[in-house]
Amino acid sequence: MDDGKMRNLRLRSELFRAIRDCFYRAGYLEVETPVKIHAPAPEEYIESVRAEKDFLRTSPELAMKVLLADGMEKIFQIGPCFRANESGRRHREEFTMLEYYSRGTGYRELAEFTAGFVAEAAERVLGSTRIEYGGKQIDLSAYEFVTVGGRLLQTDFGNLAESWYSCSCRLVS
């Protein structure tokens, strides 16, 4: 195996360990739900992968919500998911998804928890919360909670039309 592949496998393993540590520390229980299911989630924009008479899950969401309904409080799962017709450099039919739920926790608390574990995992795995993505430097610790209403209040609608017509768009195939 070449050095690049080995490095990526090690980074992936370290990342999953760091994420799990964050969830365990926060009192979450790791669960594992079936990958092969009888019926796909009814999402018109997500195409399921057939597996004989059944389907491969597109997300563990439904099975995890059953666990919440059964009384589980804080659960997470890292595991394989499948979506048909996903292809390209950044999309594959099979991928790994992190899904988590905390019953009774508000969306703002969940957003803050997410920002915290993302920054902590980056620091542990990469030694920094600063990453480069799409040619830009991003500081994962510089989390800012933004609401749609808050952004609308900050928007200069006088320049909105000008901004819209001056934007350059291109189709990506």
Q: How should these model regions be labeled?
A:
Residues 1-173:
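Class II aminoacyl-tRNA synthetase catalytic cores and aaRS-like
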